[in-house]
Amino acid sequence: MVNRPIMNTLPSHLVINAAIEKKFGAKYKLAKSAFLWGSVVPDIPLGLISIGYFVYYRFFTTQDVSGIMDKAFGEMYFNNPFWIASHNFLHSPTVLIIYAILLWRFVDKIGTRGHWWLSFVFGCMVHSVIDILTHYDDGPVLFFPFDWHTRFYSPVSYWDRAHYANEFFWVELGINIVLLGYLFLPKFIQRFSKPK
């Protein structure tokens, strides 16, 4: 059993996508809200399944719940088809590329629903790339829905101390501070440098 600290990278995903959108959003005609939603929505299905799994075992069975989440992420996450599909339909690079191909006709149709969804998929792609690079052996399934098990083995894990999680915490914190400065410092300086 790996000692899992309580980690939540959703804020980092959101900050990274917001910085990308600020720098490149106008140039590549991204729908801002869609791109930002794409930074956080991929993790929601797994979160909901995990909560449901815990609630079920805690309140509707007589089984001991100690270690239940280790079972969830040690067995269900890797082997249960529902868990795999739920987590990867917005994480797998293969399925995201398929979505982008299907939606590509909307790339220049700004303001349409199709353009919004294409921007959302681009946001999910950024999320997926970050997850692939920051999960030792539990990142997105690369070729889902064609293959349900192949994952990239990153040398770094944002949560696993055996794979530099303690060091990565500081890298992630630094990235967030720099990007938050990029996002908000110019507005802050402008606001307080106006003559009264």
Language model region names:
Residues V2-K196:
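N-terminal membrane-targeting hydrophobic helices
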